Structures are given as structure tokens and as C-alpha cells.
Amino acid sequence: MKRYFLFLSLSALAATAFAESRLPEADKAFWESKRGMLTAVWQQPFSYESIRSKHAPLGPYMGNGDIGCVAYTAYNSQTLLVSKVDFVTDGWSDWAGSGAAALPAGGVRISVDSPEGPGFDYRMKMLSNKMDMTTGTQNPVQMSSWLSVGKNYLVTELSTTSREPVRITVETYAGGSTGIYGKTAKTQSRIAQVTRRTKTEDVEWISQVGLSTAIVGAENEANVVADSLVRHTFWLSPEAKTYVVTLVSGGGMDDNARLPEAYSQLKKISEKRIRKLRQEKDRWWQDMWNRSYVETGDSLLDRHYLSSIYLLASAYNEHSPVCGGMYGVWNMDDQMNYHGDIHLNYNSQGGFYSVFSANRPELAMPFYEFIEKMVPEGKRRAREDMASVHPSLKGKSCRGVLFPVSALGIGRFYGPYWQQTMDAPFNVPLFSWYYEYTGDRDFLKNRAYPFIRECGDFYEDYLTKELWGNSYRYSIITGGHENSWDLNPPSDLAFVDLTFRLLLKYSNILDVDADRRAKWQDILIHLPGYKVIMPTKTPNEGLPVYAKNEDGWDAPSHMIQLHALYPCEVMNLNSDPDSLQIARNTIYYYGVSQNGLTGTMNELGLSAFVMGARSGFDPNILIDKMKYLIAGAGKNLLITDGHHCLEKTAVVETVNSMMLQSVDDVLWLFPDWPARPASFTRLRAKGGFLVSARYDGTQVKSCQIQATVSGRCQFRNPWKGQPVRVCDERGREVALSVEKNICSFMAKAGHSYMVQLHSGE
């Protein structure tokens, strides 16, 4: 049943997206203007050592949500490293823990037999999701590589401008950065087939991955030349293209590389089939790009915003067999940092923060499936494993779910808790957002509410009810940060607050659990406040800030005490002005005075910039600090710090939040944008509204709202104190209510509405 309604939800999104993309001229003009900035260029060969990474990709990369590729070159060759997201070994041990670990699969190397010459050029083309190379050889060869969507074909199209045929060698190999895993190689009817196998002793499961390669368009020979390598040779003719087609198969936990199935598919491969695969890929990416976009007026900011969309859509989508970790589908070393895991104390959630407002919510589907897969083990741990969190919890047993920090998408935890209990509740915002941004009640009923209730069950049992003054309060003692042990850290209180707010809201919508609401309300009323202190580190502005726990812990890095702003959203632009000002003070103290926004390793991934936008923090500072980080991006346009990857896409949510926020179900246009022109197209807001607007630096010049579900649409008057009208797509004025600068009207699904300054005519 779950798969059935998930299919319906995704189908509805796809239909909506198709309708949304019918602005061909405007969209086409926008993307053509961005083609250059979304093309990364190398004009010299780059070696394996230059792109070798145990974290984010350092070279040209592409992905389809299941397969990842990273390239390196010589003047006459290209090697495409290949990984598969569900190729995971058991039994790997390092400082981070023992258990599951993601591995690379192998690669495909294409070499040109021609002396060195001028003209080497390599281009990673994000808009078309392909990587193009011209060899630096006297007989130049053009290689265009791409991945199919939903089917794991890696295709390289070869052509030459040489007047004579050019000899080509293709090597398909299995392996990674070590030789400790099993591998095989064979040929069958000139199809190369290699496999790699995970550890086989003292393990819970075994996985195999296969790479099978066929040459289309040229007579060829295939020979096994090593225990993990098959070599094809052929002549590339100037008259026609030749295709190197590799099908990646296997993965999972059933010790099966699925070579017979791969062989069967490649025996049928043809140039016509390849064209169809390319067309399917091009359509998918065109739709993905057209979902939404922004114009910030700053080429550096625009570049990282849009390249982040490319990174997200390459790493995760509805075709992913399992959810990738912090490094998406690019696990290209046998010793990936943190096992290439899903880090549950913010890192991996941060990779999905932007997909909702960016109108690509289905990209989060693999993550939901992973979390649901972990619930049974999480329930066992809450009952039986509390002492592993902290010795003081020995003998304690809770309902609900308890997650450690680390897991792999195949459905296995590994490693310690680092004394934290927020790793399951950290997913509450993500589950709520899919419903809030799409209006999908099936998702709310069958997926979001059950998970959020598990977190509520845990908190009901874990919180301590204690006397406080003339009343009582519900306190929490937990690790607010990794390996700390804190009384009432705001980082965790915000998740408690959000969890019970959502349970009250959603239980009313679904008409369930009425008998539990009194307890939930009581907890909300009696939660401790956030500790306020004067800064203890210099320099500072001498203004009050939020501490990290009730004892007044002041560590100027990682603004975890502002989870209330984001991702929990229990503090917003409508909150008490004094509380909001203290939040801004905290951001300035940690982020500017103490240089945290750019000097701390991952404040971007930690959503500090989103927190700034949600608090109304100085937008010029936010933009300047983001640009400082973006300016340090690599040639492949990724910001890297040796540890993180996907969460750097929080630039997208930061910019979106500066341009559009849903504040207590009211749309605010450009709530934290500086006095300079900007625009956004089809950003998704809570309530299922797709919003487009243009700002000239002084006032909003246009606003269009499309309803994907029926309901009341509320927006803050963009022209405060002036009359407003709303017209539908036929120009008919709709009934509008206005109260204290908040305008509202009833929107119908599938209809668009223009918000206009009323001329009085």
C-alpha cells in the first residue's frame, strides 16, 4: 500500500511539474543565459591523484541517484570512476565505528592511440548532465559521457575529426583504492563483465556489483587481461560515432551482481536504443531544471545556487534504490570518511533542506524510505539501549525511536550515539515539510504522522517532569552537541517543541489521538525557556545571546542553540521581537564577531545562513559571507572542506528564504532581501503554492501564485497600506479579505492568480 500511494504522489508531482514547465520562451532564455556559468572547464589533463577523495568529488562528476561517476584524464585518455549507492560492505572498522561502509565499484578507461598534440579540453556540462572531452592528441577524439535516468547505463559517445581511423582501447575494471575485496573478470560474446564483492567472513550480508561493457558501432575485440580487467580494442572511424556502453548492475544485500541480466540487456543495445535513453535523460533534466530558479543579480551566487540543484538531483531522486549518504552516490574510495554514511545529527538532513522550497520535493523520497526502514531497530534501541547513550541512563527504557548518529542507506546503523538523542527527531521537520509543501494527505496520514508520533512517544518517556518555582516544567538532559551532556539545551528543546506542536496540529487534521492532546499541550506549556547570557569571548558586541545549555555554555562555533529558527521553525519573523533580536545578536556574535560564518568548518551546512534569513539578519552580511565561501569552490564548483558535501547546498534554502517565507502560513515576499533587484520563479511555499515574483530593489513589481491544492492562500501585502487585488488567469477579480496587512483568498487547485497593486480603476 505504501508503494501505491507513493506512486500516486509522485505521479501527481510529475503532472504538476509538466504543467509548470510550459513557459518555454522565458525558461529557455533563462537557462541559455546560465549555460556558461554551469559549465566547468579544464584545459589541462588532471590526474587520479588530483581528484582522489574520501569525501566530496574533486573532479568532474555526474550521477543519476544510483550511479555516480567522477573523471580523471591524461592527454589521450579519460577514466570514469564508478560507484553504486547500494554497494555496501559489512565489517568495516575505523575510528568512526564498525559496520557498514560504502565502496566504489570500478571504472571505465578509454584511451586513444595517437601522439600528444594540442587542443585538450574537458567540460562538465551541468545543464545537459554530461561530460565532454577533446583529447590532446594529433588525431583528436571527442568523448561525450552521460548517465541514463532510471536505468544504469553509462554511455560515452566517441567521434573524431581525424581523416583516418583512430585506434581506441577501452578497459573495464572492478576495484577501488585497495585490493582487499574479491573481483572477477570475463567476456561473453565480446561483452566485458567484471565484478567486485564485499567482505565475506564475519558479516551479516554480502554484496556484489557488476560492470558490463559493450561497444556499439565498431567491430571490436574483447580480452581478459587481469583478474579484474577486460580490454576492448577497435578502430574509430571518422564517418560515424561509436558508443562505449557500460551497464552497472547488482548492489543490495543478496550477493548477486546480476551479470546474466546485464548481458541480456547489452546484447539488445543499439544506436536507436541509445538515442532513446539520451532523449529520456534530456527530458528528465529539462523538467528538473524548469521546476524553479532565482535571479539574484550576482553571478557567483547564481552559479552556486544552480550548481547545488545539479548536485542534489544527481545524488538523490525517485529512482534511487537506497538513500545515499553525506557524499551522495560518489563513494570513490575504499576508506570513505565516516564510511560514506548518512549522518543523522544534521549532515544528511541538511542535504534535503532545499528541495521543498525549490519545488523538487520528490528528491527527498529515498531519505523517507531509509528512515522508515530504521524505525523497528530504533524502537528496539529506545527500549533496550539507552545506557549506550550515557551511563546515567542505565536501566531507562522508552517508547518511540532512538537513532545513533550513523547509518547506511541499505538499512543498517553503525557507530555510537555521541551522547545525543536528537538523531531521530532531527527528521521530524523533513517529514512535516513534504506534507506542508505539497498538501499530500496520504503522506501525512501514512508516513509523516506515524513517524512524528514515534518521536513524541520517546520524548514523553524521556523528559523529566520536575517542580519549578510555583509550577513544574519538563526538562531534558542530553547531548546538545557531539559528546556534550547538557541540561535543557535549546538545540533539543526546539525539537521537543516542534514535535508536540505538529502532533497537536496533525492529530486534529486526521481526527486521531484526541485522548493524547492534553498531555502534548501540557508539555508545550511547561517547556523551559532558552538560557540568555552575555558573551564570554572577545570580540563581541556586548549584547545578550542564547547559550547552548542552561548552565550558560558559550562556545562560539556551530549555532545549534538556534534550531528554533531552523530547521524547527518554532521561532520566526512573527515571534516576540526581543527573542528575535537575541537570535540576531547570537548570529552576529558567533558568525561575525567570532568569524563563525566563514571561519568555522561547516556553518553553511549547519544552516546558520538559513537561520540568518529566518531571523531577518542583515542580508548584505549573509550574501557577502556566502560569496566568500563560494569563491573558494573547486574547479567542479563544489565547496569542499575535507569532510562534507551535500549539506553545502543549503545556499539554495538560504536564498529562497531571503526571497520567500511561509510565516505562520502567510507568504512573505522578499522578507530578507537587500535593496537590489531580484526575482524567483516557481518557488514552492507551504500550502502547495508555487510563487513567482519580481523585485526592483524598492518594491515588488509582480507576483503570481499557482495553487497545486485547493485552500486559503494568505500573503502579506507587498505594498503595505496600499490597496491590492487578486485576479485569476482569465483576468477575473477574486474575493479578497484584508486584515492588518494580511490578504487572503480561496485558491483552487490548478489555477493561477496574479497579485496586483490596485490602481483604483
Map each language-model feature to its residues:
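Acidic/polar, glycine-enriched structural segments that form the non-catalytic walls/loops
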Residues: 20-341, 361-365, 371-382, 549, ...
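Active-site core of glycosidic bond-cleaving carbohydrate-active enzymes
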Residues: 344-351, 356-377, 416-437, 441, ...
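The feature captures the catalytic groove of carbohydrate-active enzymes
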Residues: 253, 323, 327-342, 394-445, ...
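Carbohydrate-binding surface patches
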Residues: 149-158, 688-714
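Sec-dependent N-terminal signal peptides
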Residues: 4-13
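Surface-exposed beta-strand/loop patches in extracellular or lumenal glycoproteins
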Residues: 166-174, 706-720
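Catalytic cores of secreted or luminal carbohydrate-active enzymes
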Residues: 103-111, 645-692, 696
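Solvent-exposed beta-hairpin/edge-strand motifs
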Residues: 716-731
